[in-house]
């Protein structure tokens, strides 16, 4: 769902930030 997409984006951002 939409929330899953948000969590995925949040995960990518978390991995991208040092």
From Swiss-Prot:
Tissue specificity field: Expressed by the dorsal and submental skin glands.
InterPro entries: Aurein_antimicrobial_peptide
GO cellular component, one term: extracellular region
Compartment annotation: Secreted
Keyword tags: Amphibian defense peptide, Secreted
Listed name of the protein: Citropin-1.1.3
Any one GO BP annotation for this protein: defense response
A matching Pfam family: Antimicrobial20
